[in-house]
Structures are given as C-alpha cells and as structure tokens.
Amino acid sequence: MKYDLVVVGGGPAGLAAAIEARKNGVERIVLIERDRELGGILQQCIHNGFGLHVFGEQLTGPEYAERFINELNNLKIEYLTNTMVLEINDKKEVYILNQELGFRRIEAKAIILSMGCRERTRGAIGIPGFRPAGIFTAGTAQRFINIEGYMVGKKVVILGSGDIGLIMARRLTLEGAKVLAVVELMPYSTGLTRNIVQCLHDYNIPLFFEHTVIDIKGKNRVEGVTIAKVDNNRVPIRGTEVFYECDTLLLSVGLIPENELSRNAGIEIDARTSGPFVNESMETSIEGIFACGNVVHVHDLVDFVTQEAQRAGRGAARYIKGEAIDNGVVIRTVNGNGIRYIVPQKLRLENLNDEINLFMRVDNIYNNCRLDVKLDGKIIKSFKKRKVTPGEMETVKLKKSDLSTYNDCSLSIEVVKE
Amino acid sequence: MFDVAIIGAGVIGCSIARELSKYNLNVALIEKENDVGNVTTKANSAIIHAGYDAKPGTLKGKLNAKGNLMFDELCRELEVPFKRVGSLVLAFDDDEMKTLGKLYEQGIQNGVPELYILSKEKVLEMDPNISDNIKGALYAKTGGIIGPWEFTIALAENAVENGVNIFLSNEVVDIEKKDFGYRIITNKDTYDTKYVVNCAGLYADKINNMVSNNKMEIIPRRGQYYLLDKTVGNLVKYVIFQCPSKLGKGVLVTPTVHGNLLIGPDAEDLIDKTALNTTSEGLNFIVEVARRSVKTLPLNMAITNFAGLRARTERDDFIIEEAVDAKGFINVAGIESPGLSSAPAISLYVIDILKNIAKKIEKKENFNPYRRAIPKFIELSEDEKNELVKKDKRFGKIICRCESITEGEIVSAIHRNVGARTVDAVKRRVRAGMGRCQGGFCSPRVIEILARELGVEMTEIEKDHEGSYILTGPTKSEVQ
Ligand SMILES: Cc1cc2nc3c(=O)[nH]c(=O)nc-3n(C[C@H](O)[C@H](O)[C@H](O)COP(=O)(O)OP(=O)(O)OC[C@H]3O[C@@H](n4cnc5c(N)ncnc54)[C@H](O)[C@@H]3O)c2cc1C
Ligand SMILES: Cc1cc2nc3c(=O)[nH]c(=O)nc-3n(C[C@H](O)[C@H](O)[C@H](O)COP(=O)(O)OP(=O)(O)OC[C@H]3O[C@@H](n4cnc5c(N)ncnc54)[C@H](O)[C@@H]3O)c2cc1C
C-alpha cells in the first residue's frame, strides 16, 4: 500500500490535519484510527464547551468531532477505523493491523502523528495502600459512564483538579453519586477556572488544595481513602490525616503524550513536554514526519489542537510537494523565567507565512504580569496578563516581520511581574 | 472418593498436582480463590535462585539448587517465559567480601554449579550500570527470572489436561478424620480422600491445626515492591542482590522476564495475613537501599507498587512431612523464599513421601507433558500474524495497546481448561492491562469480552478476588 500521507490517530488533531492537507493539494491520504469510530477522546466528552474559538459556539465533544468527520467525508478522504498502527520507522513505513487487512505495511511520503495522550495512573504517582477495585482514572470512568452506560461508584473521592477530574465530579453528581471531595496536591488547580465554578462550586463539592491521598483501604473494593495536607515539598504532614469512607477513588493526575510509536521510530522527545521536538510546521526530528495535538503537548482547549493540526497539515503538504525550505535562518525557542515549555521549539523563518502562534505553559500562578518576548536578548514584544496559571495554556501571536533577523538566534519568553 | 486432595493452588499445590498427574491417581486440587496462584505466588521477586543462600543440610539447601536445574526442561514443556540471566551478589567492603566467600562455600555444598567470585572491574565490565562503590560480587550463572503466575497457570492447565480435578472458589473450612482417610469440608462442598497434601501457604497452619494436635503457626512476613516501565527494563542485565546486612535483606534490582524492572522487597513481620498493602515507609526503604546497587534508579518510570507475604515459621526451614498424629496427611508448609525456585524439587520430594505411605502407585502411560501457551501475537513473524488473522479475525484486533494484546489472545485465555474469570486473571494470562497505562484504556473492553464469553452481565465481572466488583450498575439507576 502506498500513500502520500498517512495520519495516525483520528481525534480532532488527526481529522483537522488530514482535512488541511487535502485542502492544500495532497491527493492520496489515509487516516488510521484504532477505535471503533473517529473523534478520539471527544466522543466521550459529552459536556459542552468545545469550539468557542473555532466556531464561536458551545458544542459538545461529539458535535465538535462530527463537523470535522463530515468535512472529511465531503473531501472523500480515506480512513480506516478499528485499525492499530503498531510501528512506524524513519523510512516512513507504517505497519498496521486490522481484522480485514491483517498485518500490512504502508509506504508514505509523509506521516502526521496525532495519537493523543494517556492518563497517569496510581502507580505513576505511587499511592501506597491496598489494591482493590474501585480505583479509576477519570477518563476511564468517563468512558464507562458516557459510552458504555455503567456507573463506577456511589461515594467518590477525586484526586487531582485537572479538567477531566472536575468534569467528572459534576457528571457523577448528576448520575446520583456523592462526590465527597476533590483533592489537589498543588496550591492551585490545573483545570480551567470555568470548570471549577461550573463543576464544583455549583454543586457544593469541596476542593482541598495542598492535600493528597496517602492510603487506600479495602481488600476487594475501595472502602475509604486517607487524605493529608502536604508541606512545601509536597510531603504529607503528620497529624493532618482525615479518613473518607467511600467506594471509589478517581484519579485525574495528569496526561502523558502517547509517544511509544514516535520513540521507537527514533524521533527526539522533549523532556519538558514529553512530546516530540517540532518546528514551525510541526515537523519532528525526522524529516517528513509531523506531529500535532496532545501527542506533542497536552492542550486544554480543543480549538488550539485544531489550529496546531492545521499547521501540521499545511506543513506536510508543503513537504510532499517539495516546497519546504530547509536552509535559512533558524530561531530556537527558549524558556525564560516562569515558562515551563514553548511549542514549537524551532522556527525556520523562511517557512513562516505571515504569523505564528506560540503555545506555552507557565510554572506557577502570576497575577498582573507581562510576557516578554525577546529575540536574541532584545524585547520585541510584550503582552500584559491579568492572571496566568499552569492550568491554562498561553498563546503568543508573532508576525513574521517581528522576527526579522539575518542570523540563527534564540527567542525567549519570560514572565515578568508588574 | 479421591486418592489425593491437595489444598491450595499456589505454585506448590499446582506443581504437586502436575507431578501427581503422571500417576494413575484420582487427584483433587482445592483452592479458595477464584484463580490459581493468586496469593503469595503472584507477588514475589520472580527469581529462580541459584541455591547458595540456604544452610547446607536444610530442606531449602537440598531443594533449591535441585529445583533450579529443572526449570529449563519444565519451561520448555509448558511454554513458560524463563530466562537464565544470572545473578550477582554485590559486596561493598571487605566484610561483605568475606560474606561472599561464605555464600560461595554454601553454594558448593548445596551442589550449585558455576559460581564465581568476581572483581569490581569484571563486574562493571559485565554491567556498567552497577554502582562504582562495590568491591566485588558473587556471580551465579544459573540464577534466572520467570513469570511466576504463567508458570503456575501452566502447571495447573497441564495437570487438568492429565486428569486432575480442580475446584476453585472452595475454601476449606474443616477436615474430619475418617476410616478411609479424610473428609474435607469447604464452603461449597465436601470431598472424601485417602490422603491430604496441605499447601495452603499462609494458612497451612490453620489447615494443619484442623487435624493435628501438633500445632503450627505461620507468621506473615511482608515484602514490598516497585515495578517500573519497560523503557527502563534493561537498566541492569542481571539479578542484582546485596549482601544480607542490617540495611536490607535481599533488596534486589532485576529485569523481569517481560522486560520491566523490579525493585524490592523489604522484610517486615506482621500479624495480619491479609495485609497485602504497601506503605510509604516500606516503599521509601526499598528505594533507599536499591540506590546503593545501581548508578541511577529511574523511579519516575514506576507503573505500580505491590506487596507479598512470605509464610514463615519458627523452624526457619520448609516443613515437608507427614503429620505425626495424622496418617496420610502431608504438610508442605513454611514455603517462604526460595519456594518458587524449589517448587519442582518439592513436588518430587512429596511424591516420595506419598509413595512411602501408599506403597504402590503406578505411572500413567499416556501422560502428556506438553502444554501449549496462548500465542503471543505481537511476537509472531509477519506471515504467522497474517495466517492467524485469516484463521481467526479476533487476532486482528488489539485490545490492550500498551502490550499489544489482541482480542484473540483474551478469548483464548477465557476458554482454557483453567480459564480466566476476572479482569486480573486475563491480565496474568496474556498481560492485557499490565502495561504503563495499567488497564486505563483496555479494562472496559476486557470486561465486555469477559461478560460476552461467559454469558454474564458486565456488572458481574470482578477485578480480582471475590467481592472486587467494578461497576455498580447501569447509569441512571440511582436517580429515578
Ligand atoms: C476528558 C477530557 C475533557 C476535555 N474537555 C474539553 C473541553 O471541555 N473543551 C475543550 O475545548 N477541550 C477539552 N478537552 C481537550 C481536547 O478534547 C483534547 O485536547 C483533544 O481531544 C486532543 O485531540 P487529539 O486529536 O490530539 O487526541 P485524541 O482526541 O486523544 O485522539 C487521538 C486518537 O489517536 C488514536 N490513536 C492513538 N494511537 C493510535 C495508534 N497507534 N493507531 C491508531 N490510532 C491511534 C486514538 O484512538 C485517538 O482516537 C478535553 C480532553 C479530555 C481528555
Ligand atoms: C516478598 C516475597 C518474595 C519472594 N521471592 C521469591 C523469589 O524470588 N524466588 C523464590 O523462589 N521464591 C520467592 N518467594 C517465595 C515464593 O513466592 C513462595 O515460596 C511461593 O509462592 C509459595 O507458594 P505456595 O503455593 O506455598 O503459596 P501460595 O501461593 O500462597 O498458595 C497457597 C494457596 O492456598 C490457598 N488456601 C489457603 N487457605 C485455604 C483454604 N482454607 N482452602 C482452600 N485453599 C486455601 C490460598 O488461597 C493460596 O492460593 C518470595 C515470597 C515473597 C512473599
């Protein structure tokens, strides 16, 4: 099998990337999805709040996905569902498995990776205690409830105040369960402010900052969890333990980009994002292999995923047509004070159209601050912010003309308190 | 009426069952759990020890080295993952070098082949990730790693294939002495038998005390572990021990047979035989000790932690003997480490005791020593993969993405003669849910497949032990 472009993963990133590549003239495209249907994680996100930036309206996850799936069909882009990509390599060969075709090799001119991410587990954060049933990651519980139609518990404690945990607090409450508390290790939430208000405050669910779960009781099914306050080093403080009787513990303790395929292909991974290093076209360290969406870094808004994926789609089209420019000025992005990461990590100036959006996360909550953008040490732009938090991705839009330079150089962004 | 009833289907009970299935005997294997190997046998270091640890003259000393050498053939016959990677005991100072000398001597007396005392340079050449602070090491070439539950399941399957009757979810609550032998009463049924073999692990004392006035007491000794992701499974090439010392008795760092990295255990005597919980103290301790062995310990790659309980007795040795006041009642108790390594030799030893008691027992003519493992789809060649998918489409569908496990493998795990009934039983047989996402993605599908294949509701599927229900009911059942 031979294609110009293989897109791995049919979530919002893969869908938007495939559509954009077709609109930019790529003929033979195939999008591959291991699940029963397209749409990725959106299929289980039946709450609304999707698409404010892209469509200017509030859609549910499946509604947002549907618009892209319809467009994919209108553009007659081929796709395979129930098909797993098992391996890719630097020769741009893609190995797939499904029930009809069996194990097959596809040769591609370009590949776009959009495998999304997975959830961190209990093991990853090392909660001691028994190992009973009744411990779920929030996304797994969401799948059980919203797609399979089964309840996972009656009295629930949620660890982690990320968006998925917050949304599940509301969802469980609406389904008749009692959510006793949401417990957060850090002094701030990693979820969107609107979700804290709409999912916790509206239902009188308490949120405890600087607390964690230190023990799990129950040999067969969860019977309760012990919660304690932590000090500045995140170490539980003796004497602050409180036991909550419950049958379920939900974990919403972070997402990790799903990069096993990328890693095995030899693509370089940025330790800060856990996703591939990418350039302005979302191209990874292997020429002709692009990446977008949660596989690159974890996004909180799907609209940004879509924008980033469109960039990858255009980049892949340009690469396939031989129009990408690989010599010329290169600008590397560098984290300044207060910045945890910036994507893309590298900009090839000649390939920029007229502007570029940089995505980044800050490392703490800052009120009334500025984001200073420096090119080779000189401030070229400055953005005032009322509040930035690690829970909400920041974006900075730069014009190509802002970046006029004749040498390779670095662009840094830092948080400055006003 | 059974000839022999074995109580407890851990690695010891299953080993003995398989050995007995070579004879013309009517054998029952009675287990209180809903799966075999689901207590101590599923939570240990999974090491096939070489056999230099035990004092010469003890049963441990006799049976470990002998058992070790039986694994190649056994694992070939039963298609069980086993690797003789070799083990190293590290010494950090001159005192510990002396300890190595003692271990070496013990090993020779116990009949352990291929033991060497190596210099620091040689050790670091063999495995550069080992700490620079060592003085030397004892190298045992025969040390190995195994899949303990695969081994136990394979033994059970092969035993059943050869005629052993297995009764799961049957807890022995009483035993009566009768003229013909014993009547075993469980929470489900009664079983009459001429002879009893007590392999009840942590509860071997309870079973013994049902028939014997020679009371026994088992003390649970907990050991805790961290399991790390496959991306760091090759951190060390060998099983790395430290000298037994006050800091740590046997905290090891080892690759597992599946390519993960395992760190642990500590040792803590308890009273509660069900205390299979981990504690932050225990986990911190093993990390602290393990850090001495290797240059770096990538703990951020941890995917789970767990604990196991050793069945210790005051005798400090295996107890394998007929009870003095109960004819035909054989205790196989106090089987702490190296019980797994000794299991094949223990079963031969038990058969000898039985032969002495029963006088004439005959070998079967049609014993089949082979057991076919479930095909590991991802490890097959391209052609084999396609052939299998053509024959059975369910092999074309990946259910567990971390470990690349297909629906075909899961269905086959359910329909074996000792088939999986729970999500964790599937995991132990084919590794679905064993990977870095720990079932986050595949558990809903595994539940669906189990329910479909067993013809029950999704809500009836349990995670592991009885009572470990996962789903509480359909949605919208709580609000009217
Ligand atoms: C629970 C939850 C709630 C959210 N709520 C909101 C919200 O309210 N508003 C909002 O704007 N955003 C929200 N988001 C964020 C947004 O939905 C995600 O950022 C977005 O879905 C990510 O898109 P993606 O395409 O990168 O990944 P995904 O949607 O995860 O898609 C990845 C796809 O790749 C497939 N795949 C992976 N590996 C392979 C392989 N080897 N072979 C074949 N296919 C493969 C997967 O099956 C999946 O379908 C939420 C996210 C989550 C997880
Ligand atoms: C932390 C730790 C590390 C270890 N490391 C190693 C190692 O690396 N190498 C090694 O060789 N050994 C090791 N061991 C020892 C090894 O795990 C044990 O020796 C072995 O698993 C014991 O098997 P068993 O069959 O006796 O016990 P178990 O596996 O516990 O089996 C006993 C069975 O009896 C059943 N039972 C109990 N009561 C009843 C009843 N009333 N009715 C019916 N059934 C009943 C139980 O449910 C259980 O399934 C380790 C042990 C521990 C705890």
Curated annotation (Swiss-Prot), chain B:
SUPFAM superfamilies: FAD/NAD(P)-binding domain (SSF51905). It catalyses: sn-glycerol 3-phosphate + A = dihydroxyacetone phosphate + AH2. GO terms for biological process: glycerol catabolic process. It holds the Pfam family Fer2_BFD. The active site is at H49 (proton acceptor). GO terms for molecular function: (S)-2-hydroxy-acid oxidase activity; 2 iron, 2 sulfur cluster binding; metal ion binding. Binds 1 [2Fe-2S] cluster. It comes from the Bacteria. Keywords: 2Fe-2S, FAD, Flavoprotein, Iron, Iron-sulfur, Metal-binding, Oxidoreductase. Sn-glycerol 3-phosphate binds at S45, H49, K249, R310, S337. [2Fe-2S] cluster binds at C400, C402, C437, C442. Its cofactor is [2Fe-2S] cluster. Pathway: Polyol metabolism; glycerol degradation via glycerol kinase pathway; glycerone phosphate from sn-glycerol 3-phosphate (aerobic route): step 1/1. CDD domains: GlpA-like_Fer2_BFD-like. Its EC number is 1.1.99.-. InterPro entries: BFD-like_2Fe2S-bd_dom, BFD-like_2Fe2S-bd_dom_sf, FAD-dep_OxRdtase, FAD/NAD-bd_sf, G3P_Oxidase/Oxidoreductase. FAD binds at I12, E31, T40, T41, S45, A46, I47, V172, I335, E336, S341. PANTHER family: GLYCEROL 3-PHOSPHATE OXIDASE, GLYCEROL-3-PHOSPHATE DEHYDROGENASE. Catalyzes the dehydrogenation of glycerol 3-phosphate to dihydroxyacetone phosphate. Is probably involved in anaerobic glycerol metabolism. Active in vitro with the artificial electron acceptor 2,6-dichlorophenolindophenol (DCPIP), but not with NAD or NADP. Also displays a very low oxidase activity in vitro on glycerol 3-phosphate with O2 as the electron acceptor, but this activity is most likely not physiological. This is Glycerol 3-phosphate dehydrogenase.
